[in-house]
Amino acid sequence: MKTNLPLIKLGLASAVAIAAMGMTGCGGSSDKDSTAGGDAGGGITECISNCTASGFALPENAIYVAADAAEGSDIKDAIITALTDTPDNAVIVLPKGSFVVSSSIAVTDAEGITITGYGIDATKLDFSTAPEDDGFKFAGGNDLTIRDLGVYEAKKNAIKADGVNGIHMAYTAAVWEKDLELGGDENGAYGLYPVSSQNVLMENNYSKGSADAGIYVGQSNNIVVRNNTAEHNVAGIEIENSNNADVYNNIAFDNSAGILSFDLPGLPQAYGGGVRIFNNNTYDNNTTNVGAGAVALAPSGTGILIFATSDVEIYNNTISGNVTGGVEIASYFLADADVPNYGTNYGATMVNGWSPLIKNINIHDNTFSDNSLLSPPKTGLLEAIIQGYQFGFNHTGAQQVAPAIIYGGIGELLSNAGQLEAFNGIVGDEAKANGVNYNAYGAKDAICVSDNINKNTDADLNVGKVYGTNPFDAANWNETQTAPEASLRIDLMENNTLLDCTLERLAPAVVTIKGTVYGCSGDDAELAACKL
C-alpha cells in the first residue's frame, strides 16, 4: 500500500491551493499526488491592493478590528465590539497574525455581513483558553460569510451556523493539532458546521483533528461543498439529513472515513436525499475511529459511507488505500437489528419520514485502487462481514479480500419479503407524498454499480452483497426460513451480476447567496466536473 501523504507537509494555503487544481476525466488519476480540484470560486476577483491571500478585495468602508494588536494578544473584546450593532452588509476585517480569542464569538440574526481575516494561514485565532463552547457561533440571519482565517483548538465546534439562510465559508481552517485519542477531550466535535440552514456554500476550506466530522452539513437544504481538504478527522466530510447537496472536487485523507452521507433518526429534519458525491479524491482514510454517538458507527478504513439514506449518486471519484472498503452502503438495520421494535423505538421519527432503508444509490465511473486490504478489520461494526469474506476464495482460487464496494442488502430483502409493510401505517401523509414507503423495491429503488475502473495493483476489484435480496431464494434465510441469513455474495466489479443496473442521474444542487447562484447550475456550470 502506498504511504506517501503529500499534503501533510504543506501549509494550509498550499493544501487548499492544491484542492483547487483540476482533476477531470472519467475517474481521474489514481496517483495520490493527484488531488481533486476545480474553479476556485469564493469571490476571487482581480484584486490589486488591500486584498486577502485568496484575492478577496477589502472595501474602503470595511471595519478593521484590532489592527494594531500585538502578536499573541487577546482580541476577544475588539471582535465583540465590532460585532455589536453591526450595520447590514458590513465587512469586518480581523488582523493579520496569530491571536488569542478567550471566549466564544456569537453572531445573532445578522444580515449580509462578512467576517474575514487576511488568509487561511495569515489570520490564526486560538480559542484554547475560551470556555466550553463553539469558536464562532452564528444563529439566524441571512447571507453571511466567514473567510480567510483559521480557528484553532475550539472546545466544541470551530464554526457553527444554525438556522442561517445563505451561509458561505471559504478559505477557512478548523484545526485541532493533537492526535485523535479514544476518550481524549482535547479535540473538538465538528470543524465547520452549518446546521438547519438553507443555501450553504463550503469551499476551499481545511479541517484537521475533529473528533466528529471535519466539514459537516446537517439538516439543511441546497448545499455545495467543493474544493475542501479534510485531514485526520473521524469523518472527513459528512452530509446528514440534508436535501440537494453537491459534494465535489474535495480531498479527504487520513480520516477514519472519508466522505459520508447519513440519515439519522430523531432529528428535526427527518430525512434527506438528492446528494451527489463526485470528482473527489478520498484515500488512506485509516485513522482509528475514536468518535462517540452515530459517527462511531463509521468503520475506520472507509472511503465513502452511505448509511440509512436514499437518492445518492457517487461518480468520478478516485477511491484508494482505504483498508476496510472503498464504498460501503448500509441500512440502519446494520446498527440496530431489532426490527420488531422499530415502531416502538423510532415510530415518532418514522412518522416524519425517517426510514432505516437505503434506496436509489447510483455508483458509477469511479476509479478504485488498493482498498479492502486489511485483515483483521479495524472496526467491530463490519468485523464479522469482512472476516466472512476473507474465509472465502475468489474465482482464481486465491483467498479473496473483502469487496471494494459492499452493500448490506438486508433492508431490501425484508422489504421484498413483505416483512416491513406494517411500517407503511406509521408514515405520515407528507412523507408518503414524498415517496417514503416500505413496499417491495422497484427498479427506481435499486442500488446500482456500473462502469467503475479497476486500478488495483494485485487483486481483483470486487463488489459484494452481504444479504441476498430475493425473498424466494432459500439461501437468503436460515434453516427454518424464519430469519434472514447473510450469504456474503461476491462478484467481479466488471459485468457483475449482483448490482449491475443503471438509474436516472440526479439533478444538481442550486445554492443562491446574495443573488448569485453557485455550483453546477451557477458559477461552475462550465467546469469539467459539472459536465460529467
Residue locations for each model-derived region?
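Bacterial N-terminal signal peptides that target proteins for export
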Residues: K2-L12
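Bacterial Sec-dependent N-terminal signal peptides
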Residues: K2-T3, V16-C47
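Right-handed parallel beta-helix/beta-solenoid
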Residues: G37-T81
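Right-handed parallel beta-helix/beta-spiral solenoid domain characteristic of secreted/periplasmic
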Residues: P59, Y64-D77, V91, G112-K155
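Extracellular beta-strand/beta-solenoid scaffold signature
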Residues: K76-I79, S102-S103, F127-K137, E153-A161, ...
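Short, T/G/N/S-enriched strand-turn elements that build extracellular solenoid repeat scaffolds
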Residues: I79-D85, V100-D109, I115, L125-D126, ...
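Right-handed parallel beta-helix
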Residues: G112, T116-D121, N142-E153, N165-L180, ...
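Extracellular beta-rich repeat passengers
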Residues: A161, Y171, N249, L264, ...
